[in-house]
Amino acid sequence: MNHFIPRAVLVALLLCPFPPVAAAGQDHGQAAAAVVEVPGARGDRDEKSYRKIFEGMEVFERNRPLAPGATLRFKVLPRRAGVSLQGLTMQLRGAHTRIAIPLDADLSFELPRDAAAAQDDAMVTSNRKAGSLTWRAEIRSPGTPAKTRRLGDLLLECKVGMVADLVAYVPSPVNLLITKLPDPCRTLSINMFYFTERPLFSIALMQGARRVILPAAQLHGPDAPMLTDLQDWYFLRDKAFMMQFKPLYEQGWQDDTLLQFDYMDDDPPGAAL
C-alpha cells in the first residue's frame, strides 16, 4: 500500500539521513586515535540490539530473490573523526550469551541465527564508546562486477536496515513512524545513504543499453551543518551517495540494474598506463 506524505514532510525527509549501507573496503587510515577499551556496562559501548538484527535476518530470508545467491553480512565504519578501528572487537553478549564475532579485514562480519540469543535480549557489542560507529547491512550478489553495486542488493540492505535499526536518522515523530512502516524503502521517496570504497566522482545507472548519470545532488549528502552530530554519514560524506528506490522502480529500473562508480582518484580516459 502506498503512503501519502505531505510536501512539507517530504522536504524534511530530504534533509534527514536514512543511510544503510556501506560498501566493503573502506579506507580507515585517516583514523589515528589510540584504541580505548570501554567498560562493559550496557549503554557505554557502541552496540545494537540482536533481537532487532534477528528480525532483519528474517526480512533477508523472505526477500532473497532481490539478491540471488547473496549472504547477509554486517559492517561498521567510523562515525566521527578520531575514532580508530584498529583493535576493534565484536561480541554477541547477553545474560546467558557470550559469542565472539570474527571480523574480516574490511570490518564486515556475519552473525549467527540464534533465537535463544534474541530471547536473551543479547546485544551485538563493540569495544568502542557509544556514538563511535556507523552500522550497515552488507549484501552483495555473487558475480557483481568491480566498481558496481546491484540495485536489488541495495534495496534489500535498506529493508534489512530499517527493521534491524541500522538506519541512523534525525529523531522526530515523522522519522520514527517511517521506520515502523511495513516497507518504507519501496513505498516512500526517502533518501537512503550508502558508502563506496573511495571518494566519489559520479554514479551511472546501467541496465542493458540504458544508461543514466545520477544527479550530482545525490552525491555526498545535503548541506545541513546544524544536523552533523546526528548524521552518521557526515564524516564519510566524500564516499556517500543517496538512493530513492520508489521513483527508480517506477521508472522501470529492475533489480539487476547496476550502479557504476567513478572515483575521484580514477585515471582520466586515455591516460597512459
Segments predicted by a language model, with ranges:
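Bacterial N-terminal signal peptides that target proteins for export
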Residues: M1-V9
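Bacterial N-terminal signal peptides
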Residues: A8-P17
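Short, aromatic- and glycine-rich surface loops/edge beta-strands on solvent-exposed regions
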Residues: A117-I139, F241-P269
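N-terminal Sec/ER secretory leader and immediately downstream segment
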Residues: G25-R113
